[in-house]
Amino acid sequence: MRLSPVEKEKLFLFMAGELAKQRMDRGLKLNYPEAVAILSCYVLEGAREGKSVSELMKDGKHVLSTEDVMEGVPEMLEEIQVEATFPDGVKLVTIHEPIQ
């Protein structure tokens, strides 16, 4: 299987997101990279499902709470930006203050 660099990046991100979900399901608090992975996967999968940029920006704030992550992570993650492929092209999705 031959993957482009962008496809490889999305695959690694998906794998990191799945690992983070497993850890969260076991009751572990997520660190910074795990939180970024889960939020990024949410955006990529949401775009694939046909959600709009505005829906993802709004709903992305409710994916993780401060109780899901380690101390200090919400302050380190002021915003997240993900390039996602929508039916009408690639768009940048920005979620401000994604962990509340």
Swiss-Prot record:
<dbReference type="Pfam" id="PF00547">
    <property type="entry name" value="Urease_gamma"/>
</dbReference>
<dbReference type="InterPro" id="IPR036463">
    <property type="entry name" value="Urease_gamma_sf"/>
</dbReference>
<dbReference type="GO" id="GO:0005737">
    <property type="term" value="C:cytoplasm"/>
</dbReference>
<comment type="pathway">
    <text>Nitrogen metabolism; urea degradation; CO(2) and NH(3) from urea (urease route): step 1/1.</text>
</comment>
<protein>
    <recommendedName>
        <fullName>Urease subunit gamma</fullName>
        <ecNumber>3.5.1.5</ecNumber>
    </recommendedName>
</protein>
<dbReference type="GO" id="GO:0016151">
    <property type="term" value="F:nickel cation binding"/>
</dbReference>
<dbReference type="GO" id="GO:0009039">
    <property type="term" value="F:urease activity"/>
</dbReference>
<dbReference type="GO" id="GO:0043419">
    <property type="term" value="P:urea catabolic process"/>
</dbReference>
<dbReference type="InterPro" id="IPR012010">
    <property type="entry name" value="Urease_gamma"/>
</dbReference>
<dbReference type="InterPro" id="IPR002026">
    <property type="entry name" value="Urease_gamma/gamma-beta_su"/>
</dbReference>
<keyword id="KW-0378">Hydrolase</keyword>
<keyword id="KW-0963">Cytoplasm</keyword>
<dbReference type="InterPro" id="IPR050069">
    <property type="entry name" value="Urease_subunit"/>
</dbReference>
<comment type="subunit">
    <text>Heterotrimer of UreA (gamma), UreB (beta) and UreC (alpha) subunits. Three heterotrimers associate to form the active enzyme.</text>
</comment>
<comment type="similarity">
    <text>Belongs to the urease gamma subunit family.</text>
</comment>
